[in-house]
């Protein structure tokens, strides 16, 4: 593990075999970049990070893996966006994707294999999500991929609702000259959903379990009703594949979701996002998990390059 100065901050670098990982644990527990050195000496970016001049709006940078906690996507309370209501019926604010991605973290583990970091809630986050908890993000880096674990420990006396997730930005295309049509997404979903501006989830669009990434219907689509915990993106011709495995500890995977998104057809990235459930989970209840007093739940994601 190596410390590197970067735009007035110190980021961390791990070299594991031919893989290099860059992260800034204290800012959103953010994995910034994953790249691989190929046999000919060239470097291929897998997790995308853009060229930026400053880190002032770190959470707004489209790159790396922003952590989404306590809830993914937009939340609503009776059609009003950026609010939510808990079991007590009190309306509270909740920004898109929650508070962790723009939050501060304290590093609790730092070694040659990765890091763990604990969320330090701001006063705003404490008021909006008023529970006694520990939220910990842990990465373990390997030669051909990594594991990331989201852990919520309930230190209080009431159940804590959550539905966290990841917002991975992947470099696309992987190979010069290829297009999005050359990449195949395979997700074992039995249902697709769209999130409406009212907060409701509606069914559609109609998609197969095997789609190329140039299909515009994939953008902002929630894939759920998963028949398995494995999905992938494969490059035609070379057969190179990013394989995802997800898992849960002490809770059900019934409403687990994969969200696909990109900003436009010219963006140098494509987001494939494992979520614990669909957006607006406090209101729609789909994918909403509860951690009992004294209990712990985990959401696990493994990504490997084959």
Task: State the predicted function of each range.
Residues 1-147, 155-161, 168-306:
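Surface-exposed acidic/polar loop and edge beta-strand patches at domain peripheries
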